[in-house]
């Protein structure tokens, strides 16, 4: 698979993953039946797995490694992804373990972190130097 194909797959998965995250949060917030639909528990992890695999493929093909001088932006991006995942879990908490207020705060914070991840990926300039 070429770098262009991997990048295209990665970007499509990003768009689908973010769109489903926003939709699932909205459905949950509004109490819509789609929030509890079976497919909303199956499809997002499949897309996120493809996203992860395409990202690993891009790392292998481009030889840009995290935790190196040339890959410092990628290191920051990976930490951002971890923070985004944690905030996403809080925002979409289906066990009702967290308050509505915690979910309400976690959702926009996740979107801010997502913006930072996208900025790092597009500029390849680390925020922390």
From Swiss-Prot:
Summary of the knockout phenotype: Not essential for the ability to invade cultured HeLa cells (the invasive phenotype).
Full protein name: Protein SirB2
Ranges facing Periplasmic side: 1-2, 63-71, 126-129
Transmembrane segment boundaries: 3-23, 42-62, 72-92, 105-125
Underlying gene: sirB2
This protein's GO CC annotations: plasma membrane
Lineage: Bacteria, Pseudomonadati, Pseudomonadota, Gammaproteobacteria, Enterobacterales
Organism: Salmonella typhimurium (strain LT2 / SGSC1412 / ATCC 700720)
Subcellular location: Cell inner membrane
Keywords for this protein: Cell inner membrane, Cell membrane, Membrane, Transmembrane, Transmembrane helix
Membrane topology, record value: Multi-pass membrane protein
Domain of life: Bacteria
Family: Belongs to the SirB2 family.
Signal sequence region: none
General function of this protein: Required for maximal expression of sirC, not required to invade host cells.
Topology feature Cytoplasmic, residues: 24-41, 93-104
């Amino acid at each position: 698979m070429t770098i262009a194909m991997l990048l295209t797959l990665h970007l499509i998965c990003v768009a689908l993953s973010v769109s489903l995250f926003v939709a699932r949060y909205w459905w949950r917030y509004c109490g819509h039946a789609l929030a509890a639909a079976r497919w909303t528990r199956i499809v997002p992890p499949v897309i996120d797995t493809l996203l992860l695999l395409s990202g690993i493929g891009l790392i292998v093909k481009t030889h840009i490694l995290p935790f190196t001088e040339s890959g410092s932006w990628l290191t920051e991006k990976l930490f951002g992804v971890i923070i985004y995942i944690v905030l996403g879990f809080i925002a979409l908490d289906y066990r009702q373990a967290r308050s509505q207020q915690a979910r309400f705060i976690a959702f926009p914070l996740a979107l801010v972190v997502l913006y930072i991840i996208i900025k790092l990926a597009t500029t390849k300039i680390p925020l922390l130097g």
